[in-house]
Amino acid sequence: MAAARPTSVRDLLHDAPRSLRVLSEEHADGWGIALRRNDTWAVKRSTTCAARCESYAGLDQEAVLAIAHIRKKTVGDLSLANTHPFQRGRFVFAHNGTVDTAPLVAATAPEHTASLVGTTDSEKLFMFVLTHVDRVGEVTAGVTAAVRALHALGSIGSASFLFSDGDRLYAHRDNRR
């Protein structure tokens, strides 16, 4: 979610017919949300199903940017380190799908692979995107370069993601298998 002024995330999280709470019954391996307020990210995550988590039930906050995620694990064990969204400084990232990580890691800067905390394909995809942002030196052009590089890799899986630098929200939908 991106808004010009602080906006409630309640509908997205709780009230909509396909809210993350409802969808978490199928995607029950944890949840996370990054809320941008006062030029700072507040990131909350849990390995508990959102529909059964007390701290999730209490979420009704406002933000100008929000990235929320419910996890159905495919790669990486159930742990906070593997729960989205991931944050590195001002950058926040969440991914949906499963990707082959070998080509991603091969094209990722060593300093980013060294900073991996968890074991998911998603965090490796995040480091791939950050590598391109660093190489290009500008966020929008870097995200664009990362998407082009993903397409050049061919069929590596589903690489749909949300990415933010704290000012803008980028969304990429890619369901190639």
Q: What are the roles of these predicted feature ranges?
A:
Residues 46-57, 68-89, 107-111:
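Short acidic (Asp/Glu) patches
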Residues 27-30, 37, 61-63, 79, ...:
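Short, basic and Ser/Thr-rich N-terminal targeting/leader segments
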Residues 2-4, 36-68, 125, 129:
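Short, compositionally biased leader-like segments
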Residues 100-165:
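Short histidine
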Residues 33, 97, 125:
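Residue-level signal for inorganic ion chemistry
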Residues 83-99, 148-177:
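Conserved catalytic micro-motifs used in adenylation/nucleotidyl-transfer and phosphoryl/amide-
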Residues 38-46, 95, 101-113:
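Cytosolic regulatory regions built on CNB/CRP/Popeye-like sensor folds
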Residues 1-48:
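Extreme N-terminus nucleophile/cap motif
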